[in-house]
Amino acid sequence: IDVAKHPEYDIWIPELIFGHLRTSTNYKKNEKRIVGGKNGFGFKLVLIWSTYGMIETIDHVRGLKYVQEFNDNLNEICEPKITKCKGTKPYTRVIFKPDYKRFGIEGMTSDLFSMLKKRVYDIAAVTDHSVKKIKITFNDELVNVSNFSQYINMYIGSRGDCKRIHESGDERWEYAVALLSLIHI
């Protein structure tokens, strides 16, 4: 992610990406895509349903680290802290605290924790690791799923445990089908 001001909007690009609704470019419904974006909503919706959020990203080309906090369901967007950094590999990290009251709960439930953890594993399974080594973590623990096949194995076991049809239809889609008597997610 470029740590620079957007030439048209005069807003820092990370803030535009993560903190302002309808800022992506994937609005054409007839266009073939290899991503499943939600028209620029993504993490912004997480921030709207959170009491606190933070983004941290490294722009290794410009040698800048960008940190910005968001509070009160995205009602407060804090000024970013931008510092110089040299020789650091690029990454983006997001942190958030759900607004438990809005969800009608007092704190993190085991169901919510499991759902959030599953979504992180979903992301790890569909992230393209072929271009560069991308590390995905959940609560500072490395997620050891780097492809869709490993993701399937988490739920139904190895090919020896459970027969399946697993194909890559083209560069855009990968899918699997298995017959199970019982699946527990």
Which residues does each PLM region occupy?
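Short secondary-structure boundary/capping segments
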Residues: 7-10, 70-73, 111, 146-156
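Phosphate-interacting basic helix/loop segments used at nucleotide- and nucleic-acid interfaces
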Residues: 31-40, 112-119, 123
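Contiguous hydrophobic segments
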Residues: 42, 183-185
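GHKL/Histidine-kinase-like ATPase module
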Residues: 78-79, 114, 118-125, 129-183
